[in-house]
UniProtKB/Swiss-Prot annotation:
Pfam families named in the record: EF_TS
Keyword line: Cytoplasm, Elongation factor, Protein biosynthesis
Domain of life from the UniProt record: Bacteria
Keyword Cytoplasm attached: yes
Coiled coil: none
The protein's name: Elongation factor Ts
Family designation: Belongs to the EF-Ts family.
Chief subcellular location: cytoplasm
Length: 271
């Protein structure tokens, strides 16, 4: 008996963009395990798998101040453009700086205007008639470069980046912040990539090469090449620099005498 339902098949289709039969077969092969089903679909070449899985349906904005970054969600872009909603976001990120709240729960308990952040969110939610959610917060304590990006001129920022660094190269740090916003690096260095993710990518590369009919003796070289491609996509220091494609981000930073210690990227509606 199958360990999944028609609703599970529908959900996997929404996550991956693959066809109904492909999703049904992937769930059957994985005994209902969604992660394994997604991996199986990637091996078989389903388009946009993984990318759609990270998506969430949300509107809202990101706001930053003095090394703090928050994401505040609403249901429609109409509310995202609302002045009161934007002011609330500014007040919340200021509260994050003042309270040094390291997570959402701590920030919700922080004070703004004689009430908690959670109470302020609830009050505005009741007033405008939409569900509002403080989704995440990040605070860095060192020297920080901040970049906010708008998807359209009439919308508030939807992408926010914080880059903590050492060294005097503010221009290089800004270039890296733009890089992170555009190319969506997930990890600072290769060593930061979880071992289980590396193992999964290696397995996917090998199985994909086999599906393509590549000769057995060529598999190790092909797998390593594709794994290196994954690292160049996901790891900041290994990405080609957008400001100088002949150099990696690491080379750009080395030339400027800058060391990135950590970074974070928030995008509204993304995991």
């Amino acid at each position: 008996m199958a360990n999944f339902t028609a609703a599970d098949v529908k959900r996997l289709r929404e996550l991956t963009g693959a066809g109904m039969l492909a999703c049904k077969n992937a769930l059957a092969e994985s005994d209902g395990d969604f992660d394994k089903a997604v991996e199986a679909l990637r091996i078989k070449g389903a388009k946009d798998v993984g990318k759609r899985a990270e998506r969430a349906t949300a509107e809202g904005l990101v706001a930053a101040k003095d090394g703090a970054l928050i994401e505040l969600n609403c249901e429609t872009d109409f509310v995202a453009k609302n002045a009161e909603f934007q002011k609330l976001a500014d007040d919340i990120v200021a509260a994050a700086v003042a309270s040094k709240a390291a997570d959402v729960d701590a920030l919700k308990a922080a004070s703004i205007g004689g009430q908690t952040v959670e109470e302020a969110i609830g009050a505005l939610s009741a007033k405008i008639g939409e569900k509002l959610e403080l989704r995440r917060v990040a605070i860095f304590g060192g020297t920080v470069e901040t970049y906010l990006h708008r998807r359209a001129a009439d919308l508030p920022p939807a992408v926010g980046v914080l880059v903590e660094y050492t060294g005097a190269g503010a221009e290089a740090a800004h270039a890296v912040a733009l890089q992170i916003a555009a190319l969506k690096a997930r990890y600072l260095s290769r060593e930061d990539v979880p071992e289980d993710l590396v193992a999964s990518e290696r397995r996917i590369a090998e199985e994909t090469a086999k599906e393509e009919g590549k000769p057995e003796q060529a598999l190790p070289k092909i797998v390593e090449g594709r794994l290196n491609g994954f690292f160049k996509d996901a790891v900041l220091l290994e990405q080609p620099s957008v400001s100088d494609s002949k150099k990696s981000v690491k080379a750009l930073l080395d030339d400027a005498g800058v060391t990135v210690t950590q970074f974070v990227r928030f995008e509204v509606g993304q995991a």
